[in-house]
From Swiss-Prot:
Pfam families: ILV_EDD_C, ILVD_EDD_N. This is Dihydroxy-acid dehydratase. Binds 1 [2Fe-2S] cluster per subunit. This cluster acts as a Lewis acid cofactor. It comes from Roseiflexus castenholzii (strain DSM 13941 / HLO8). GO terms for biological process: isoleucine biosynthetic process; L-valine biosynthetic process. Keywords: 2Fe-2S, Amino-acid biosynthesis, Branched-chain amino acid biosynthesis, Iron, Iron-sulfur, Lyase, Magnesium, Metal-binding. Its EC number is 4.2.1.9. Homodimer. The gene is ilvD. It catalyses: (2R)-2,3-dihydroxy-3-methylbutanoate = 3-methyl-2-oxobutanoate + H2O; (2R,3R)-2,3-dihydroxy-3-methylpentanoate = (S)-3-methyl-2-oxopentanoate + H2O.
Amino acid sequence: MSSDLKRHSRTITDGRTRAGARAMLKAIGFTDEDLAKPIIGIANTWIETMPCNINLRALAARVKEGVRAAGGTPMEFNTVAISDGVTMGTEGMKASLISRDLIADSIELMGRGYMFDAIIALVACDKTIPGAAMGLTRLNVPGFLLYGGSIAPGHWRGKEITIQHVYEAIGAVAAGKMTDEELKEIEDAACPGPGACGGQYTANTMATVMEIIGLSPIGTAAVPAADPRKDSVGYRAGQLIMDVLRRDLKPRDILTRAAFENAIASVALTGGSTNAVLHLLALAREAGVPLTLDDFDTISRRTPLCCDLMPSGKYSAIHVDQAGGIQVIAKRLVDGGFAHGDAITVTGRTLAEEAADAVETPGQDVIRPLDNPIKPTGGLLVLRGNLAPEGSVVKLFGYERTYHRGPARVFDSEEAAMAAIVGGEIRPDDIVVIRYEGPRGGPGMREMLGVTSAIVGAGLGQSVSLVTDGRFSGATRGVMIGHVAPEAARGGPLAIVQEGDEIEINLDERRVDLVLSEEEIADRLLAWQPPAPRFEWGVMARYSALVSSASEGAVLVTP
């Protein structure tokens, strides 16, 4: 418990020498009474370029009301936000992962510059969540994340659809399985309003993670963006931050090794996005908590997959709310012994205490009981082998084949692979290789939802696999192996795969191998020459020079 709630902001607001600062703040409308109170930063990721974050301006207003009611003075600021869905399949997607670290930097800079006493970060689209968490952890002042909520599903010909179905329809049209008119109907119906993409894709995966890890108040994320209850969620969050400030509860108090294990278990139990691997590795680094790829595989092996959620399952994200919310997921984790129930959360209560308050909707089958899981192990697998010595990641739902040996179809960019798929050049049993799309090589490690959806839409989802040093959208399904490390641009074995080489994927043995002798692989690696950097100046060049391997979270490393 802290007795000085203004121990940071008084440096900005108090005393004769700060008259200039007060004069400028009064020009905005703040009064002496306002400036005598604790200053609460409202880090907003509102932006007008996507539905995911479009509701955050209105949500921020309710948060600020709650802060004022509880005795604080809110000050709102904004960060950048890049939409994966809007930029997918273009050069713009290279900015997405890079924005995660820029968001972290901007929140850190604002916190250090204005010396806020506490911070609430309003987040929604994929990279805003880990970026904000990383920034708060660096500052380590009282604070937490508030998720804007999921979009409602669209409806087309009697079934629920999401953005995933739009991308898969593009592939179906290219394969002659759907008309352009039907694609237009799906396009017009898939996204009916505000909110983040509506399956257990990356945004909802990370929103779940943040509640289970303890950095978001449990019971807030599952409330959909357009639901009238969201106003109350925002107001109560504004009140809660003042309580968190009084208790002096900081991110690094919450982000223990046990909390990270809980977070990984939540990804496994819900069939969450492989992007969670990158983001949790990066967040653990900021928190000073040892975490490796192997931890994800170990925890996933012992955690059942219980949530029947898109992209591979039946339900969209709003059904989690209807089933009882993330509290029910927490209860499954705690009751099954898959999570550390004594881990503290931002409310001051333990995960077990929060889970005990879960109110499950009778008869719901979105979050299955522990004695009837979709499959007994989680969806995340970490593969190694001579093609991925430092590791790679794949997400499974349970219906995919576990062994595939086939010829490599090699592409040095996402665009080249997409052209081959929509041009009908990919055949059953092919293994598509997309390289030079890693953190350094892209740069920015683009998501491949357009490619993977085109494969599925063309009817090849069960017969074609994909291997890449890029990454995947949370909406991806099928045997799609990403995050291959070392990446091709660092001279990883992916760089020396040739068209027609045999690749062997054995998911049961957690391996992905190039079927060549060690001598042949060594000779090819010796002869390999790195390509010229794709950017020579600006943020892309700087990122490419400083970014670490995907196996380390693709974080920026200080030279």
